[in-house]
Amino acid sequence: MAEYTRSISFYGREIDINIGLMAPQAGCGVWLTSGETSVLVTATRQAGRAGVDFLPLLVDYEERLYAAGRIPGGYLRREGRPPERATLISRLIDRPLRPLFPEWLRDDVQIVATTLSVDDKVPPDVLCILGASLAIHSARIPFNGPVAAVRVGLVKDEFIINPTYAEIEAGDLDLVVAGCADGVIMVEAGANQLPEKDVVEAIEFGFEAVQELLKAQQQVFADLNITPVELPPPPQNEELVAFVAEHAQEEIRSVLRQFLDKTSREQQLEAIKAKLEAQIQARPEGDPLRLYLLENPKELDNQFKALTKKLMRQQILQEGVRVDGRKLDEVRPVSCRVGLIPRVHGSALFNRGLTQVLSITTLGTPGDAQELDDLHPVDEKRYMHHYNFPGFSVGEVRPSRSPGRREIGHGALAERALVPVLPKEEEFPYVVRVVSEVLSSNGSTSMASVCGSTLSLMDAGVPIKAPVSGVAMGLIKEGDEVRILTDIQGIEDFLGDMDFKVAGTRAGITALQMDMKITGITVDVVEKALLQAKAGRDYILDKMLEVLPAPRPQLAKTAPRLLTFKVDPEDIGKIIGPGGKMVRSITEATGAKVDISDDGTITVSSSVGGQAEAARAMIENLVRRVEEGQVYLGKVTRIIPIGAFVEFLPGKEGMIHISQLAEYRVSRVEDEIAVADEVVVKVRSIDHKGRVNLTRLGISPEEAARVRNHHP
């Protein structure tokens, strides 16, 4: 492809598009630059593999630290496993693209977005979505796009398109909206307890901005004479379709109307499918349908699922009844328990239907904060939420692996939902980690993790501003007929058109994530879903607060105790000491852990009472300004003919002249004191070089008793 360039003016910024300069052997390489943020997005298609019955789409976002002028740490000095943020951006790019590919496409498709440079203003993620849409079309891959995305911020009650990092940090909303010609196709947001109406306005504002990027892409395609590539659906075996409908339709409908639990329903559906398979196998060897299934063994399963999907959707659309008997806006039974696990700092077990999540809270010190080594300006996290999804939670046998993209994404969503209600560091200096263990899954485990996290934090005594609950909303849409479902279970997620996760407090929304399986919905449908979700969230929150109405007034006995105080930043070196000698000695002497910030904030933690106070006293003694007349308890370190040296503060010595050892005349210093003796001394004078002269004279019994009693 010949090199093509174009520049788009978009909300006060230029977006420079270059197609064809880079990655000539990829299907297409698109290089986009906005400000000093630059990304390369490639799209490549490869002939499908035999036996694949799904779209093998792979989306990878690659961060290179050279983009920020940095060299990676570690022995190898190169990037290793993608950081969590890269995984989240990969998912963010994937989610608006996937619904727009023909569902029958079986070719391998890979999108790779590489950040080449970043500035401190333009986040690369939404730029990558634009680049992916351009690359897919330019590579002549079947795709029902174009698609584009924008970020919407809210600063001082004003919506901003594609805000800078600073504006995102200062604002109350961080919303990404993706859309295509048919409507909104993806939403992801974190918000500071925003009312539903404000969020809807933000989505509408963002969707209007998306239209400009869609028009710009159409102009690019017109310039390059690129037309959409059509991929007609593969022909169906009409005999198989008719056979499945004739022999299974009424039985499937009967199962769906029995309002069974997940396990019973799946067992009965599997029995119906097995009977179909047996009927076909009983046919003569030369029977066309039997031969067809020998060549296409997955087609019976595909047609059975398609019929089940059709009947479930008909039941919801025509009768307003779901497969478990619930109304469209009804939440499954909710139950909660807290404080189940001994020794941990906080725990909660949250049940909603057959979905069960155990959330456990751990409180740590500032030194336990997670250091982030990526291209984002934020370099550490004080709150971490980790989500685990073992095979047994869905009755499967599979080996345990490191967290996959789904687990990372669900964990991050639940984390985002709680961040707006966490106390400020000045009020609660602990680093907090919550782990949500999915013990049973039948839909919406991420929102169950939000509810479990809230209760676990409250059980741990974390003074959150308000409790947060979450619910997943679904959608069934056929033509103009639309039904919104509250608290979807697994089958409704799998066979439905939308998974819209909404989390928030009574005051407003804290996190959103909407994924579509169809090519977009209107903002009106989004608004209805949010309002219906509000009722569901409030119902769940009521159930949670029946168990634990407020954070516990005290931390768990096993939680570390923290003391926080400030010192002059110039004194930090004294506290650390050469090679960390002094701070290590404090830890060894007291058993407390010491964390030091660059601004002079000292946090001392201990699990045993008195340790933190002892460490604080030692630190305060280290940085205390020595003044004449102050009285100390010191230790004799060495003796010379004319006197003795006494360490009266850690690392600080002064000399007692022989004439200041006693009220009477002392002939030999050794006759009065010895090395390692503890002595009460007073600062007599400090000379121009900072040398301290001490005395044992003129100290009252009360002063001596005071320093002995308060010495750590």
Swiss-Prot record:
It holds the Pfam family PNPase. Involved in mRNA degradation. Catalyzes the phosphorolysis of single-stranded polyribonucleotides processively in the 3'- to 5'-direction. It comes from Synechococcus sp. (strain JA-3-3Ab). Belongs to the polyribonucleotide nucleotidyltransferase family. Mg(2+) binds at residues 493, 499. InterPro entries: ExoRNase_PH_dom1, ExoRNase_PH_dom2, ExoRNase_PH_dom2_sf, KH_dom, KH_dom_type_1, KH_dom_type_1_sf, NA-bd_OB-fold, PNPase. Disulfide bonds: none annotated. NCBIfam families: polynuc_phos, PRK11824.1. Residues 629-697 form the S1 motif domain. Residues 560-619 form the KH domain. It is found in: Cytoplasm. GO terms for biological process: mRNA catabolic process; RNA processing. GO terms for molecular function: 3'-5'-RNA exonuclease activity; magnesium ion binding; polyribonucleotide nucleotidyltransferase activity; RNA binding. It is an enzyme of class 2 (transferase). Its EC number is 2.7.7.8. It catalyses: RNA(n+1) + phosphate = RNA(n) + a ribonucleoside 5'-diphosphate. Its cofactor is Mg(2+). GO terms for cellular component: cytosol. The gene is pnp. This is Polyribonucleotide nucleotidyltransferase. Signal peptide: none annotated. Keywords: Cytoplasm, Magnesium, Metal-binding, Nucleotidyltransferase, RNA-binding, Transferase.
